[in-house]
Amino acid sequence: MKEYQIHLELDRSQQNNFLYPLLFREYIYALAHDHGLNRSTIPLENGGYDNKSSSLSVKRLISRTYQRIHLSIYAKDSNPNQFIGHNNKFYSQMISEGFSVIVEIPFSLRLVAFLEGKEMAKSQNFQSIHSIFPFFENNFSHLHYVLDVLIPYPIRPEILVRTFRYWVKDASSLHLLRFFLHEYFNWNSLITPKKSNSIFSTRNPRFFLFLYNSHVYEYESIFFFLRNQSSHLRSTSSGLLFERISFYGKVEDLVQVFVNDFQDNLWLFKHPIMHYVRYQGKSVLASKDMPLLMNKWKYYLVNLWQWHFHVWSQPGRIHINHLYKDYIDFLGYLSRGRLNTLVVRSQMLENAFLIDNAMKQFETTVPIIPLIGSLTTARFCNSLGHPISKPTWADSSDSYIIDRFMRICRNLSHYHSGSSKKKSLYRIKYILRVSCVKSLVRKHKSTVRVFLKRLGSEFLEEFFTEEEHVLSLIFPRALFTSRRLYRGRVWYLDIICINDLVNHDKLEIVPN
């Protein structure tokens, strides 16, 4: 056992003046044509959002905002609080969008410098979330215990302002941020956007996602510091921030965003192996250690959240699971280790021996019950899994209805192609197929038997052969290979976000 006295200081060399581009409008126009940003492999205008958040559009919005300010000044009955408030949320949204774009610019420039320094290949596979599962297969099969962690998030706006102050120089940016948070704050909308009517949940999620990035980045930086202090090998860790917000980087200087809020000394054991993976608000910490040491890490995480982030973490947010007994619910898959016994007959002179070899594998399956719950919420089936019609699509054309169902079925098959057992996936396809037929029958006021007889049996086969057809295009000269891959596990490295129907974890995260 070795004692470490932690003294972490803030490195302010990375701070920026974020509000000045809003005050001096030409600066943001120059940034839009910056040569470094144009070379970036991940553009400033992120593809996951609409074009309203582009830098040039924000420049126009800021110009209109200045005109609004002059009109408010010269108006006789002008109210200083009327410019941005409940009576005029549009201009508040305009400024928040501009603020969101500007605060992402320094991180985009860091990304350009990082990619050029490392000479990293420009590949979309770098963004794929399915690349996590090959990592599980290669590194988790020989481990024993896993910490299944739901990262808590602050429910008070001032905590976010406190976190964000490490990135800024000008106090005016903090005041503007504090105004946005106190005026329209609804942190629950970030995790459960479907249940919230907040203006940011429907019109400007980019602003809150950046704040969530800042919050999680600070937590992970401190966690990586503790991990490196307790590891034999001080490895460099790669960090990927929340979804597709143009934030990729290398966590090398792990003392940039730290504080001195620990009141006790940390007693750390030497850990030979530890792996950490996170997506959105859920993370997995795997180790070969005994449950006692995993409980130690659970204790450290809870104290980190409470002492530094002032967030009360319920004990149920961290579970210690045995990798070969319990499942890991992560990215829409149920994953766990599996021991396969292989009997080998050994002959030595006149004696024969039967040797049992335990082969460790990492299997991934489709969580059928949560997925049926998502289909029930989307009105494709009832709570028992029986297919029902989709009345909201009754006014659409037949080709549109069939195309919508085929697209949903194809996306689910594509996302769950890495499942070890295809039986659950076949059941989901069956629900979507019958729901499509019932929707068409309801539209034409006919019966299922008559409609299928008129439509033909080819329609029923398309739902099951679509993925195999895609693999046959990839391997056109090896039909047997494509069929074998279809029955086996295939990880597609073009998937960069979780499927909406698969993302049932969102509905389970609640504030502390």
Swiss-Prot record:
Subcellular location, principal: plastid
Biological processes per GO annotation: mRNA processing; RNA splicing; tRNA processing
UniProt GO MF annotations: RNA binding
UniProt subcellular location: Plastid, Chloroplast
Keywords carried by this UniProt record: Chloroplast, mRNA processing, Plastid, RNA-binding, tRNA processing
GO cellular-component term (any): chloroplast
HAMAP family xref list: MatK
Family stated for the protein in its record: Belongs to the intron maturase 2 family. MatK subfamily.
Function comment: Usually encoded in the trnK tRNA gene intron. Probably assists in splicing its own and other chloroplast group II introns.
Record protein name field: Maturase K
Native species: Acer campestre (Field maple)
Gene behind the chain: matK
